Amino acid sequence: MAAMPLTLLWVMYLLPSHFALPLPQEAGDMNKLKWEQAQDYLQRFYFLDSKTKDANSFKDKLKVMQKFFHLPLTGKLSSYIIEIMQKPRCGVPDVAAYSLFTNKPKWTSNVITYRIISYTSDLPRIKVDEIVAKALSLWSKEIPLSFRRIRFGTADIEIGFARGAHGDFNPFDGPGNILAHAFPPGPGLGGDVHFDKDEYWTDGSSLGNNFLYAATHELGHSLGLSHSNNPNAVMYPTYEIADFQSFKLARDDVESIQELYGKRSD
């Protein structure tokens, strides 16, 4: 075969980039990779329709996110929005789809059982047990519920560590970004809490993901709370509290959980 002329080779090299579709206005100054990452984020946490991810639906969902995080409603990506999207966070969506969390699911019994079914190698098992009990106590001191640990059988709330796909159609993504997720009260997976085993979990004595803070947040979901848009609340979707050692439930957390269960009287 005769050698292909260099001019033709150069034209063929330029064709893909020359005819590549430009990104929509909503992409702002972001590149294609960040545009696609933003689409995935909005699809997961704001229910951007995966079948109709056009510029208009993207703009609408981005405005919902901007409103949630108290940002100007531009409908356009920015480096700051990308920064928020890349923060470690809970895997539960920030807005409810259909009846998820919107019908105020709650436990009907005043005694809730829980079981720790698997552990992380980052912390001693007894430390995980202590932290889970402490996280539950932060909630129970505000509402007329008590929690009883069981070691065998099926509990109302089952807590464990897993990696990747783990049987609930919500696979973990490896180190960073999604740290954990939980399900609202109900049968089956209802109330269960899953932590990403690929994350590095700590008790606050070293750098890493503070397990007490994450457990308190996820157990809030187990009790029926959705995400709060109050940055001071434990139920805020991203994990960014500066002082993990002395954190406590914010007024927003307390008022929300007491709206579901009432105040503790003793």
Identify the residue ranges that each predicted region occupies.
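Zinc-dependent metalloendopeptidases
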Residues: A2-D266
